[in-house]
């Protein structure tokens, strides 16, 4: 009888140990982040995102709603197939509960996986309107190109540009930027005399620069990703197009804060529309920008603040769900969320799961020997005007 009682006690203790072990295991919350850390043109995206994610977790800790966060960041090189493989491994092998993804091609590649797995996924550096329509579990606290292009068209037309040329890369974000700009510019009574699309990989700008010179528009609306904008702007200036009176306008990518000083004084006076500048005048941003630069030796840009805001979205949603990572529960918590970001006030549109934020008109100016995107006009709480219907 005593032996039986002891055995029961041992069994009960073992069962309690198993339960405790399960509880301890359950308290760890795995977040898998797939971004480009290498690869021509996109490695800067990963660098900015990683710095912002690190800063947010340092400031807010790694325990949320009683669950210890375990972040895994993997490099997809900006390659869609690599991202698909990595995210599949994260879901199946690593048992991650929340996913973070970087640029447009990789986000589109993983959309079917995310929908099937029903994993809440924060999109950090995809500017294409279509992205959040590709999975009901995508949510974006980053940026969208269409509102920037739309606002840029409105501002350019109201400030004297009548005839413009558009020049973009032939991929989803470029086409969307072009479409938004053209739509709004024509609505405002302007004329788009030619729309030029060029290859995404290693484009030769020379013939396109000559074409712009021959057309002699009032302005050229330009959109290129990564480092291509800096190369184009430099060649534009070297070939004398700036002196011809043709203005360059574009979304914020054109004069990204991280690269601006390397672009040189030919960028002075260039006008862009974007959701964030490292020079944004608020106490929160001054602290944020100074800390990022101090810790990493580069300026934060719009990609950086997208990563920072994405982490805020995840942390606050987990607090609302008390640590529950069910995809539908997290998405419900994220929809309609609003907060003060280093970029200014932002929110998540409950219908589209997309960011709503201010779009600032900025001029490149030299202050204390450095080039900055100085904001001088604000369009508040701008939604994506070109948004396709959400799924």
Regions found by a protein language model. Give the residues of each.
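N-terminal secretory signal peptides and thylakoid transit peptides that target proteins
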Residues: 1-14
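Beta-alpha junction/loop-to-helix N-cap segments that form part of ligand/metal-binding clefts
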Residues: 28, 47-48, 63-132, 198-205, ...
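Solvent-exposed, acidic/polar segments of extracytosolic/periplasmic ligand-binding ectodomains
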Residues: 29, 338-391
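Extracytoplasmic "Venus flytrap"
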Residues: 32-52, 74-80, 167-175, 227, ...
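Signal peptide-proximal N-terminal region
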Residues: 50-71, 187-189
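Extracellular/periplasmic Venus flytrap/periplasmic-binding protein
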Residues: 85, 128-130, 136-239, 276-287
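Periplasmic-binding protein-like
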Residues: 90, 94-103, 122-124, 165-168, ...
């Amino acid at each position: 009888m005593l032996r039986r009682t002891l055995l029961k006690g041992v069994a009960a203790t073992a069962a309690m140990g198993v339960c405790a072990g399960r509880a301890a295991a359950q308290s760890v919350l795995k977040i898998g982040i797939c971004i480009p850390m290498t690869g021509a043109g996109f490695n800067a995206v990963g660098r900015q995102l990683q710095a912002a994610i690190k800063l947010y977790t340092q400031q807010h800790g790694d325990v949320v709603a009683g669950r210890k966060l375990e972040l895994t960041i993997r490099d997809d090189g900006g390659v869609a197939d690599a991202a698909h493989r990595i995210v599949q491994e994260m879901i199946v092998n690593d048992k991650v509960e929340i996913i973070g993804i970087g640029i447009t091609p990789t986000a589109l590649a993983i959309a079917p996986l995310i929908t099937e797995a029903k994993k809440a996924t924060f999109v950090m550096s995809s500017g294409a309107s279509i992205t959040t329509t590709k999975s009901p579990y995508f949510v974006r606290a980053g940026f969208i190109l269409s509102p920037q292009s739309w606002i840029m068209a409105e501002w350019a037309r109201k400030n004297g540009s009548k005839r413009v040329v558009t020049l973009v890369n032939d991929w989803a974000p470029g086409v969307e930027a072009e479409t938004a700009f053209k739509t709004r510019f024509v609505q405002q009574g302007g004329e788009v005399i030619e729309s030029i699309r060029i290859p995404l990989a290693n484009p030769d700008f020379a013939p396109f620069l000559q074409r712009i010179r021959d057309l002699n528009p009032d302005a050229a609306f330009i959109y290129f990703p990564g480092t291509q904008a800096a190369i184009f702007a430099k060649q534009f200036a070297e070939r004398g197009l700036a002196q011809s009176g043709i203005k360059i306008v574009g979304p914020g990518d054109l004069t990204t804060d991280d690269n601006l000083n390397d672009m040189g004084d030919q960028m002075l006076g260039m006008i862009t529309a974007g959701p964030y500048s490292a020079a944004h005048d608020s106490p929160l941003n001054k602290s944020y920008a100074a800390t990022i630069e101090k810790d990493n030796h580069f300026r934060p840009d719009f990609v950086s603040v997208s990563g920072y805001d994405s982490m805020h979205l995840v942390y606050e949603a987990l607090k609302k769900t008390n640590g529950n990572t069910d995809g539908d529960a997290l998405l419900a918590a994220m929809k309609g969320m609003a907060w003060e970001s280093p970029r200014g006030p932002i929110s998540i549109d409950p219908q589209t799961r997309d960011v709503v934020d201010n779009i600032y008109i900025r001029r490149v100016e030299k202050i204390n020997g450095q080039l900055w995107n100085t904001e001088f006009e604000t369009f508040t709480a701008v939604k994506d005007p070109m948004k396709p219907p959400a799924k």
